[in-house]
A protein has these predicted regions:
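Short glycine/serine/threonine-rich phosphate/pyrophosphate-binding segments
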Residues: 110, 114
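Nucleotide and nucleotide-moiety/phosphate-recognizing core
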Residues: 1-105, 115-129, 136-141, 148, ...
C-alpha cells in the first residue's frame, strides 16, 4: 500500500522552523526516523520511505503555501495514490499549542495551503493533521506570528509534538484513520 505524506510550508531559509512550516518539520522528522533522503524533484522535495511493507511518498512542496495543491495533485496522480491515503500536515492557529487534530475531511479553516489543496483535488475529503500552534499574538499580527520562529519556552513541547506527529503518520498507515483519530484528538501534550 502506498501513502502520500504532505508537509505544508514555505520554501526558503527565512521560513525554516517557523510555526507556518511545522508541516515540513514533521515530514522531515518522519523521513529522518526511517532513514530516508529528500531529493529536489518536480514541485517538491521528495523522499521515498519503506516501512512495515508500506511505501510512503513524502513531499514538502516548493511552490509556496498558497500553491501547495499543485504539488499534492501532481504527486498523487504520478504515484497513483488514492485520496484516502493522503495525509496533509499543517499548522493551525485555532488549536492551542498542546493539541493536534486529525480529520478525514473538513474546511480549509482560512488556511491558504489547505485552500489550495482543496481546489487542486476538487475535494475537501482528504485526511489532514492539524498541528496546534496557538494564537498568542496581538490583533492584526497573525502573519508575523505564523511566520515567526518558536519561542524558547515553546521548543520542548514542539519537539515532543513533532515526535508524536511522526507516530500519527505511522498509526495512520498501520492502524487506520479512525483508531488514530481516537488517540490523537483526545490527547493533550505537555513536557
Amino acid at each position: 500500500m502506498k501513502f502520500l505524506i504532505v508537509g505544508l510550508g514555505n520554501a526558503g531559509n527565512e521560513y525554516t522552523h517557523t510555526r507556518h512550516n511545522i508541516g515540513f518539520d514533521v515530514v522531515n522528522a518522519f523521513v529522518q526516523k526511517h532513514a530516508g533522503k529528500f531529493v529536489a524533484r518536480r514541485l517538491a522535495y521528495v523522499a521515498e520511505v519503506k516501512w512495515k511493507g508500506k511505501m510512503f511518498i513524502c513531499i514538502c512542496p516548493t511552490t509556496y503555501m498558497n500553491l501547495s495543491g499543485t504539488a499534492v495533485k501532481y504527486w498523487m496522480d504520478k504515484e497513483k495514490i488514492a485520496i484516502g491515503n493522503i495525509l496533509v500536515i499543517t499548522d493551525d492557529v485555532s488549536l492551542p499549542l498542546n493539541k493536534m487534530r486529525l480529520r478525514p475531511s473538513g474546511s480549509d479553516g482560512g488556511h491558504n495551503g489547505l485552500k489550495s489543496v482543496e481546489a487542486s483535488l476538487a475535494s475537501r475529503d482528504y485526511p489532514r493533521l492539524r498541528f496546534g500552534i496557538g494564537n498568542d499574538y496581538p490583533k492584526g499580527l497573525q502573519s508575523n506570528y505564523v511566520l515567526g520562529k518558536w519561542r524558547k519556552e515553546e521548543e520542548p513541547l514542539v519537539k515532543l509534538k513533532i515526535e508524536k506527529a511522526v507516530e500519527v503518520i505511522e498509526s495512520f498507515a498501520t492502524r487506520g484513520l479512525s483508531l488514530t483519530m481516537n488517540d490523537v484528538n483526545s490527547a493533550e501534550y505537555s513536557v
